[in-house]
């Protein structure tokens, strides 16, 4: 089968490798230039979290070891507030970790791996201008295929052309907050996600292999304490110092970095159907989500594994319908979880009641066989997102009883167990 994959990002390259290894011929069409070239622009230092779903996909194609070689394990989050830092572990043992990876480095590794597969051809600088059936048109050439995959991101061209053929539902939602990235020099305890929850903003920072952190500040776009109201250096400096405390001590040039670029937008995409007449969407083209659960790339990798399996099990036409049926309900759940986690990171990590509930949930995960936190099911397993949420709801109904009837006693017993006392 001849396959054209539009987009040479994470999902496109991952899928190309998988399909080519099954014997399909794959052309990957990318509008940008080759990022591996000598004249490629310098890549931004974006770091992202690699969870078990993403690790499983990389393991399948033999790239996990290479990806982890420059990754930094994140065993929990460190929350900074009022000059103090508290540690919240992600899992119950050393296997339940996330890994911070540089997006650019991982994309290069995937491109190199795709280029090494004889049945894959990479076409850079080819912008898709039309789609007729399974014929993909660019100004330079036309690609004929048996299957077209749109892996071209939240602003997908393939999706636009697909929607001209079929009655489609489409929802693009922008958060009224934006983001700006900056670099934090080396800090203590780098093997964690660092969070500064302010009253009017949020900073999240991923660790890098050199000991530094890649920070992201999230603020409203508008208002006196939003990006639009903080363009003056003195005003921005005063706000950042008041809102995020010790962060300004860690980053002497925080204000210049904060003002260096325009803030980016945060977008979520939902659409249906994902497929029609041998054209299918994967990754952000099908289900872009807000970044606050750290699952965008991981979900895209999982899409590739599921689509690959469906194509192996069914005829191409049936495979695409089976893929959408298996994935779309769960990525809809992920979109809800990602939006919800924004509220948790921004507001609830400061709440004593919320933190107590989290501690009880975490302790039950250590003491009660079969009990897993929602975060653990999402980040440390491959349980479908919807199944994980349903299981968490069942547990939380029980947890309400624990909180009312003995949560404090349970925590005290757990502390005694850890300290070796009876």
Identify the residue ranges that each predicted region occupies.
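Conserved Rossmann-like nucleotide-cofactor binding loop
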Residues: 11, 34, 155
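Extreme N-terminal starter segment of soluble prokaryotic enzymes
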Residues: 1-4
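Conserved FAD-binding catalytic core of PHBH/FMO-like flavoproteins
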Residues: 112, 126-129, 135-262, 266, ...
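Conserved N-terminal helical subregion
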Residues: 51-181, 233
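Glycine-rich FAD pyrophosphate-binding loop
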Residues: 20-43
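C-terminal helical "tail/cap" subdomain of flavin- and related membrane-associated enzymes
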Residues: 309-422
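Conserved mid-domain beta->alpha element of the FAD-binding
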Residues: 8-21, 150, 182, 260-340, ...
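Acidic/histidine metal-binding catalytic segments
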Residues: 69-72, 121, 242-259, 315-322, ...
């Amino acid at each position: 089968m001849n396959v054209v994959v539009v987009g040479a990002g994470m999902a496109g390259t991952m899928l190309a490798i998988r399909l080519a290894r099954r014997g399909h011929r794959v052309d990957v069409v990318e509008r940008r230039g080759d990022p591996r070239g000598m004249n490629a622009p310098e890549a931004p230092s974006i770091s992202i979290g690699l969870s078990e779903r993403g690790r499983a996909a990389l393991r399948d194609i033999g790239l996990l070891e290479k990806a982890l070689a420059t990754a930094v394990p994140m065993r929990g989050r460190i929350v900074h507030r009022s000059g103090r830092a508290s540690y919240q572990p992600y899992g119950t043992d050393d296997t339940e970790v996330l890994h911070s990876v540089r997006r650019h480095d991982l994309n290069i590794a995937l491109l190199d791996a795709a280029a090494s597969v004889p049945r894959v051809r990479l076409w850079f600088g080819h912008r898709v201008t039309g789609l007729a059936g399974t014929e993909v048109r660019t100004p330079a050439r036309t690609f004929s295929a048996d299957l077209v995959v749109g892996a071209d991101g939240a602003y997908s061209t393939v999706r636009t052309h697909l929607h001209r053929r079929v009655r489609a539902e489409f929802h693009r939602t922008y958060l009224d907050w934006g983001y700006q990235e900056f670099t934090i020099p080396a800090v203590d305890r780098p093997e964690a996600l660092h969070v500064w929850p302010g009253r009017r903003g949020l900073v999240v920072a991923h660790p890098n292999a050199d000991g530094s952190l890649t920070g992201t500040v999230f603020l409203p776009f508008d208002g006196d304490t939003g990006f639009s109201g903080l363009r003056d250096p003195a005003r921005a400096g005063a706000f950042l110092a008041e809102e995020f405390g010790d962060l300004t001590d860690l980053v002497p040039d925080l204000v210049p970095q904060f003002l260096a670029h325009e803030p980016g937008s945060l977008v979520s995409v939902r659409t249906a159907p994902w497929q029609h007449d041998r054209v299918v969407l994967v990754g952000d083209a099908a289900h872009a989500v807000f970044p606050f659960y750290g699952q965008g790339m991981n979900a895209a990798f999982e899409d590739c594994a599921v689509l690959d399996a469906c194509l192996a099990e069914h005829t191409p036409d049936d495979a695409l319908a089976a893929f959408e049926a298996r994935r779309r309900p769960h990525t809809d759940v992920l979109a809800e979880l990602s939006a919800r986690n924004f509220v948790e990171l921004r507001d609830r990590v400061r709440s004593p009641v919320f933190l107590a509930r989290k501690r009880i949930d975490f302790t039950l995960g250590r003491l009660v066989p079969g009990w897993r936190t929602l975060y653990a099911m999402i980040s440390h397993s491959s349980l479908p997102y919807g199944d994980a949420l349903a299981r968490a709801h069942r547990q939380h109904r029980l947890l309400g009883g624990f909180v009312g009837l003995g949560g404090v006693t349970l925590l005290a017993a757990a502390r005694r167990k850890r300290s070796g006392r009876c």
